[in-house]
């Protein structure tokens, strides 16, 4: 039985800031943002929206009345929670009028929350193949005015309906994973903005990717030729390319060009 993403949608606000305008305001070269980071626009969240409205708006675009009857679980992966106790998933569950006998909860783990939610959804559908799980990844990234992280800010939400025999994408059962306790990025209680060591965070990203790449080759007996494409989580646009280039030495030039 295949399990995976049957439907997917996303939502971002109507407001954005052009990165050239931000560069001019900060008296810096726009190419630092456009080329150095690969960022052209920054989504801006209005005061009337939060991760709940972003997530509900994304999900509303794909769910039918029949889906809402079949959903047993609503999971929100976020590090921009609106409450220390109340889950955003519970509010979204109500806004979307999903049948009441469903689990609704939130997963917080920096950049990993949405992926963890997908793994949880997969396992549930494997045990309950006639039921569905709604997974939402929603965040509002804020670093403060004139900080190093300012040009990497943004906001948005992705909604995914996880089912058996999906129309869009089926998950393989070959995941590999890695954990390390580092303080490159965190936001303690009482802080409005995260504490970030940008250079360290970049290096941790690359090092973690190369370690998990080697582990994947070892466990699943794969190499780059087994992949049509590689999808990255992106703190900013260029980060994925930097990580990919870290494994280029093991590939012929033709393979490098294909993947990049």
What are these model-predicted stretches?
Residues 1-48, 147-214, 219:
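Condensing-enzyme catalytic core mediating Claisen C-C bond formation in acyl metabolism
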Residues 5-7, 33, 62, 74, ...:
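Buried hydrophobic positions in well-ordered alpha/beta secondary-structure cores of metabolic enzymes
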Residues 9-11, 77-82, 109-114, 137-142, ...:
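Acidic, glycine-rich active-site loops and adjacent beta-strand->loop/helix elements
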Residues 32-36, 40-53, 79-132, 246-260:
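Conserved catalytic cysteine-centered active-site region
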Residues 58-72, 210-228, 247-252:
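Phosphate/pyrophosphate-binding loops at sites that engage ATP/ADP/AMP, CoA/4′-phosphopantetheine
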Residues 72-80, 106, 230-231:
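Short glycine-rich or small-residue beta-strand-to-loop segments that form or flank ligand, phosphate
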Residues 126-159:
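Flexible, glycine-rich active-site loops centered on histidine and acidic residues
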Residues 200-217, 227-241, 248, 260:
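A conserved active-site cap/scaffold subdomain adjacent to cofactor or substrate pockets
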């Amino acid at each position: 039985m295949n399990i995976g993403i049957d439907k997917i949608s996303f939502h971002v606000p109507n407001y954005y800031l052009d990165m050239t305008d931000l560069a001019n305001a900060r008296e810096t070269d726009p190419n630092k943002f456009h080329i150095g980071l690969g960022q052209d626009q920054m989504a801006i969240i209005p005061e009337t929206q939060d991760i709940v409205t972003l997530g509900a708006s994304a999900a509303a675009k794909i769910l039918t009345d029949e889906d809402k009857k079949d959903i047993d679980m609503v999971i929100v992966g976020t590090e921009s929670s609106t409450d220390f106790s109340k889950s955003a998933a519970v509010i979204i569950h109500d806004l979307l009028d999903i049948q009441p006998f469903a689990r609704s909860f939130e997963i917080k783990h920096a950049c990993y929350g949405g992926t963890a939610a997908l793994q949880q959804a997969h396992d549930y559908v494997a045990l309950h193949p006639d039921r569905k799980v709604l997974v939402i990844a929603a965040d509002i990234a804020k670093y403060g005015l004139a900080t190093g992280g300012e040009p990497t800010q943004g906001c948005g939400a992705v909604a995914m309906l996880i089912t058996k025999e999906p129309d869009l994408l089926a998950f393989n059962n070959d995941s590999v994973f890695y954990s390390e306790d580092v303080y490159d990025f965190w936001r303690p209680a009482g802080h409005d903005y995260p504490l970030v060591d940008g250079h360290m965070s970049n290096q941790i990203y690359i090092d973690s990717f190369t370690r998990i790449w080697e582990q994947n080759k070892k466990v699943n007996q794969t190499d780059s030729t087994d992949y049509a494409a590689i999808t990255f989580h992106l703190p900013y646009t260029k980060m994925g390319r930097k990580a990919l280039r870290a494994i280029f030495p093991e590939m012929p030039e033709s393979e490098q060009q294909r993947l990049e």
